[in-house]
């Protein structure tokens, strides 16, 4: 077959496929397609930088996992607030039945416009999630958590019954069904997950995440969040410092880490992020324990410098603007 006939046959095939499956179902990559990936800011400047595209990619699956009390829910609540600030609709599938509305509100989540579901079984949770995604009406959906998605057979069965592999099969089927729909609807789908220890592992990492391997494979971004240290004011514990590592990314170079301060009651410390990044970019000078901008002293020690910025919102906003401009981040 000549090149001309091949081209005509290809054009005909493309038209037939588009007619059968709808516009956009198939295309040539060079046909004016937008190769840039849309993103919703994570609510953390440091994490937006680590993610490489300024936030969570739309139309993709994201897994956030880590030990208990490391900041997983806080991280996702900030993302939800960020999506709502951009005019997006957010759904929260609360399989753990543990959402604290007051804390969510304190972090900026608009509770009046938050779509909330507290399902009884794993199948119900995933069916609700799929229906919401298919509707095309939401911009972000959060499932909290994969470990709490209990298959119906396990709930209905006896405590002594063996249900090995049920949850993994359920998640595998859900991922196969949902991944295409998530991509078409341009939704950010965030799955929160916990960490478990494999029994009898002598070498290598004994830690694993529940729900089988499907979520690992289908996720475009996997974030591991771990508590690094406590933040104290005198003897009182007022927050934690956590490290978020981009373990996997199909949209940007992975293995970057963001360090964030999570303050009890208020969430991610904006002043802490801006201060650290300003020092990195030499916008703020750090000499010994002192922080200063030219002749203006911000304070001795990181906590005092953070407080100084919080007391001077104009200076904080100015530094944040410079940081965002340098890293090409949107608000």
From Swiss-Prot:
GO biological process: DNA recombination; DNA repair; SOS response
PROSITE patterns assigned: RECA_1, RECA_2, RECA_3
Top-level lineage group: Bacteria
GO CC, any one term: cytosol
MF terms in GO: ATP binding; ATP hydrolysis activity; ATP-dependent DNA damage sensor activity; damaged DNA binding; single-stranded DNA binding
Gene3D superfamilies: P-loop containing nucleotide triphosphate hydrolases (3.40.50.300)
Protein function: Can catalyze the hydrolysis of ATP in the presence of single-stranded DNA, the ATP-dependent uptake of single-stranded DNA by duplex DNA, and the ATP-dependent hybridization of homologous single-stranded DNAs. It interacts with LexA causing its activation and leading to its autocatalytic cleavage.
Family: Belongs to the RecA family.
Name of the protein in question: Protein RecA
């Amino acid at each position: 077959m000549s090149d001309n006939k091949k081209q005509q046959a290809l054009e005909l095939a493309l038209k037939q496929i588009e007619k059968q499956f709808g516009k956009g179902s198939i295309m040539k990559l060079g046909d004016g397609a937008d190769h840039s990936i849309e993103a919703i800011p994570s609510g953390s400047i440091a994490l937006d930088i680590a993610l490489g595209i300024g936030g969570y990619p739309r139309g993709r699956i994201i897994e956030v996992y880590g030990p208990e009390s490391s900041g997983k829910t806080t991280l996702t609540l900030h993302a939800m607030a960020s999506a709502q600030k951009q005019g997006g609709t957010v759904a929260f599938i609360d399989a753990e039945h543990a959402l604290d509305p007051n804390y969510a509100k304190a972090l900026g989540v608009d509770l009046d416009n938050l779509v909330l579901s507290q399902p009884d079984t794993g199948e119900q949770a995933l069916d609700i999630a799929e229906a919401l995604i298919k509707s095309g009406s939401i911009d972000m959906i959060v499932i909290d958590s994969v470990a709490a998605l209990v298959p119906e057979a396990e709930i209905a069965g006896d405590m002594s019954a063996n249900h090995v592999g049920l949850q993994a099969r359920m998640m595998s089927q859900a991922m196969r069904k949902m991944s295409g729909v998530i991509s078409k609807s341009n939704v950010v789908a965030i799955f929160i997950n916990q960490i478990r220890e494999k029994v009898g592992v002598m070498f290598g990492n004994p830690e694993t995440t529940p729900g089988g391997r499907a979520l690992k494979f289908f996720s475009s971004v996997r974030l591991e969040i771990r508590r690094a240290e406590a933040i104290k004011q005198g003897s009182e514990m007022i927050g934690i410092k956590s490290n978020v590592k981009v373990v996997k990314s199909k949209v940007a170079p992975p293995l970057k880490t963001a360090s964030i301060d999570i303050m009890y009651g208020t969430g991610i410390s904006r002043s802490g992020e801006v201060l650290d990044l300003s020092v990195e970019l030499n916008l703020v000078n750090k000499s010994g324990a002192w922080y200063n901008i030219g002749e203006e002293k911000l304070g001795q020690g990181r906590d005092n410098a953070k407080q100084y910025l919080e007391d001077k919102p104009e200076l904080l906003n100015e530094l944040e603007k410079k940081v965002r401009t340098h890293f090409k981040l949107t608000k």
